[in-house]
Amino acid sequence: MSKKLYIKTYGCQMNVYDSVKMQDLLYPYGYEPTENIEEADVIILNTCHIREKAAEKTYSELGRIKKLQDARKKQGLNSAIIVVAGCVAQAEGEEIFTRTPYVDIVVGPQSYYNLPELISKVVRHEKHLIDLDFVEEAKFDQLPEQLYPQGASSFISVQEGCDKFCTFCVVPYTRGAEFSRNVEQVYREALKVVSSGAKEIMLLGQNVNAYHGKTSDDKVFTLADLIRHLVKIPNLERLRYTTSHPIDMTDDLISLHGLEPKLMPFLHLPVQSGSNKTLKAMNRKHDRDYYFDIIDRLRKARADIVLSSDFIVGFPGETDEDFADTLDLVRKVKYGQCYSFKYSPRPGTPGATRTDQVPEHIKSERLTILQKELAAQQLAFNESCIGSTMKVLFDRDGKFDDQIIGKTPYMQSVYIKNPNKDLLGKIIEVKITKAALNSLSGEIYR
């Protein structure tokens, strides 16, 4: 009789990738995935620590799981094994057992390949097991090949960790130093997902454009080299990468956007602030003019490229003038979509120790203003697509029986009616007929 595995994933695409790998790791040990937490024998929360709210979601969910465990106990059923994985695990470690003593395992993002052994120890009645080692090479050497197809679009982790040490960010402390997978590993995984039906691959990394992976003969590949290598794979039709740091946007990578048709004309390039003073305080290692120059060069290389970004409002010391500079940058760049957040002090980071914290109500006011501007830009871009014909990769069912959803080269969701679902996994030309803030609607172009 098979055992059931439930995984809940928080945060970035890297965590989504890691969750898939956890699933693949445990399948040979008899654990089959389920979406029903009540029938799970093992429950894994793969967590995010980038903001306080994200971290507290973990403890809220653990509280709900505790109630589920108590109910099972009353019914005479076995308790599930509870695992906290990911960046909250790495950052808080033993504190998780203190706050939630019913958790069995705490495992970091670089050591989850040990989950089969850790779970087997819990089955043998060991408790409060923790593994937070930083050994990236061991992680990627130990991870299995893909067992479950990811669908028409697949994630592949090629780079992990960060050496930039932005003063607001916990990633260097939770994911470790920058590390690049070797080229052959990445290529084999790409071949596997394409043979399983993927038409698109998203290359993942905390600073993916800092990729410097080695070949079997010790030649070092940049991200541009890796992309040129991967696009040769038959039946791979689209390639993307995220997340990028402006200072690692090389001339070669920028020019590749204009030369390689399989590289999609959409780039997520976080800037965080439009104020030079704030950028310096954040230790971003560039100023606004440098960022503008990167954008100009990208648009010269490929005129139809669309940008997205991340913004933090209310970083310590941010003044009204600094915030005005951020709005000015947003209006000059004109983004297709963006993510924006209030600054959240993270324990252990330099930003958290500053005495010039911005009051919460000012952060909220600034975020409202910024998000209004970003939403207007996103809607304007979506509306500009009405009447055009776009190639859409259909990758999932819609809410209604006769509906399927795909994405454009610019990562916009597109809804169409297709009762037979025969277009899933295919790239089809669609005429865009309607636009909303977060999606497009269309019909098959005949």
Swiss-Prot record:
Q: Which UniProt keywords apply?
A: 4Fe-4S, Cytoplasm, Iron, Iron-sulfur, Metal-binding, S-adenosyl-L-methionine, Transferase, tRNA processing
UniProt-annotated location(s): Cytoplasm
> What does the entry list as the binding residues for [4Fe-4S] cluster 2?
162, 166, 169
User: Which EC main class describes this enzyme?
Assistant: transferase
Domain of life here?
A: Bacteria
What PROSITE patterns does this protein map onto? Answer: MTTASE_N, MTTASE_RADICAL, RADICAL_SAM, TRAM
Which cysteine residues pair off into disulfide bonds? none
Q: Which residues form the TRAM domain?
A: 383-446
- Which parts pass through the membrane? none
Q: Which reaction does it catalyse?
A: N(6)-dimethylallyladenosine(37) in tRNA + (sulfur carrier)-SH + AH2 + 2 S-adenosyl-L-methionine = 2-methylsulfanyl-N(6)-dimethylallyladenosine(37) in tRNA + (sulfur carrier)-H + 5'-deoxyadenosine + L-methionine + A + S-adenosyl-L-homocysteine + 2 H(+)
Could you give the cofactor binding note from the entry?
A: Binds 2 [4Fe-4S] clusters. One cluster is coordinated with 3 cysteines and an exchangeable S-adenosyl-L-methionine.
Q: Which GO terms describe its molecular function?
A: 4 iron, 4 sulfur cluster binding; metal ion binding; N6-isopentenyladenosine methylthiotransferase activity
Boundaries of every Radical SAM core domain copy? 148-380
Family named by the database record: Belongs to the methylthiotransferase family. MiaB subfamily.
Function in brief: Catalyzes the methylthiolation of N6-(dimethylallyl)adenosine (i(6)A), leading to the formation of 2-methylthio-N6-(dimethylallyl)adenosine (ms(2)i(6)A) at position 37 in tRNAs that read codons beginning with uridine.
Q: What is this protein called?
A: tRNA-2-methylthio-N(6)-dimethylallyladenosine synthase
Q: Which organism is it from?
A: Rickettsia bellii (strain OSU 85-389)
